[in-house]
Amino acid sequence: MKKIIYLLAWIGVALASCSDESSLPIQPEIPAEPETPKDEPAPEKDYHQLPVLHVEGRYLKNEKGETVNLHGFTQTYSPFFNDNAWTNYDVQSCLSYNKRMVDGIVAAGWKFNFVRMHLDPYWSDDTSKPFVRYEGHERFSETRFRKYLDELFVPMAEYFVSKGMYVVMRPPGVCPNEAPYQGIEVGDSYQQFLLNVWDIVSQHPKVKNNTDIMFELANEPVNIKGTDGAYGSTSDACFANAKIYFQSIVDKIRSHCRNIIWVPGLAYQSQYAGYATHRIEGDNIGFAVHCYPGWYGSDAEKDSGEGIGSSTGGGYESFQRGWDKQVGPVAAIAPIMVTEIDWAPLKYDATWGKSITGEAGGKGFGANFKYIADNAGNVSWLFFTTRSHELAAFKDVPGTEGNYTFLNDPEACPWAMYHWFKEYAEGVTVNGEPERLELMGEQATRSLQMGGVHYLKVKAVYKDGTSRMVTAEATINSSDEQVLKVEPTGKLVAVAPGNATV
């Protein structure tokens, strides 16, 4: 094991002639039948209002070529999640309530520029059919889905766009996983359901080629039957079939439109590495990721219960390692959109994820996630909530220790996200040049085994006492790249025996 010393640096037309002897009498030219003019198809109406976005390499970009990362929230349209504000499939009451919520959210100062819209199965379920599972596809009614796509979902999408927000549509319900299912399988009834849903949505005249609207193909696939016949979520055999499964849906959509598509992973949208080998083909494609405390080696107060995380974590570094292993391979080739994430201390019982904001580079979940996302440079993300009224009720008034609430506790996601999203939208005020740079938690020397990884964390401290993480902005060089390789965002990889200075 070798020691590595770190220091930071910054016709032609052919004319056939015949002899007189072989000349034939000239035949009179018969006029051609006049062609009946063909009706030209009417040009498609362009419904988009927001700046056009597209996928370019690993980034989401606008027409100026600028990288765009979106920040948003979620809405679903079941009365159960909306204070039972309507009953009996009352479209107007649903629209009225949710538009009021959007107005309240904007008035509260939230800086959202996209929404994840659940095409909730409350509207498309045929309740005369037997119940099989929570939010299952087994009771799907195409007739009802078409009706409420026209009457509810598209009008609501138009309202979001009028407020400056892109819309990411998510299909009704969740992927099958528990009995009577073991997961999903190429050619199964759920794949046929998704093909039908996206065939309908991608041909809708107000959605087709409308760049304000994007598609998240499915919600939380867990296991898939691999090419080896075994169900799982991480093996090469599973991702070989995941590529086939979702490629067919991508191809169906692309036969109609070019809207941006977000492809889910496996294991509740936490496993993606296999897609680096079994790539989804086509343009305007990114990956939709879920992230909760305890996943990816992150800190949590309590396990969220899916069986893919834990109630312990190793602070920043173990979180970063887990992210790099499970999401990193696709983040290197395509943009990422985190379509579910939240956290709050366990005592509030207000979020799916139980953890604290913590400190970037240290303990906790929220600040470390933001740090990882910011360093990646191509991650859009949101506040996963089913309670819009809480966002509308938010007040930007600090709480007092001992009297904090879910909404104003700095260790819960609403307070942190409100201010972070504001910074993303308005920019960060930097008070002059930094007074000093700090390498967080570093020693003068460090040893790494071959193939070992370590993450530098660079903090800038300003004269007014404020500080911010600047790792992604720092220039970090190795004195010997044959020994120690420096990857973006402070990642150091030991590639050969020897010594190197950073």
Label the predicted regions.
Residues 2-10:
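Sec-dependent signal peptide recognition
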Residues 15-17:
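C-terminal motif of bacterial Sec signal peptides marking the signal peptidase cleavage site
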Residues 19-21:
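Bacterial signal peptide processing site
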Residues 27-116, 128-139, 425:
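N-terminal carbohydrate-binding accessory modules
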Residues 50-53, 77, 81-94, 106, ...:
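Extracellular glycoside hydrolase catalytic/binding regions
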Residues 53, 98-99, 162, 432-438:
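A broad structural signal for short, well-ordered beta-strand segments within beta-sheet-rich domains
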Residues 91-176, 193-194, 245-257, 353, ...:
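Aromatic-lined substrate-binding rim segments of carbohydrate-active enzymes
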Residues 430-502:
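Extracytoplasmic soluble-region selector
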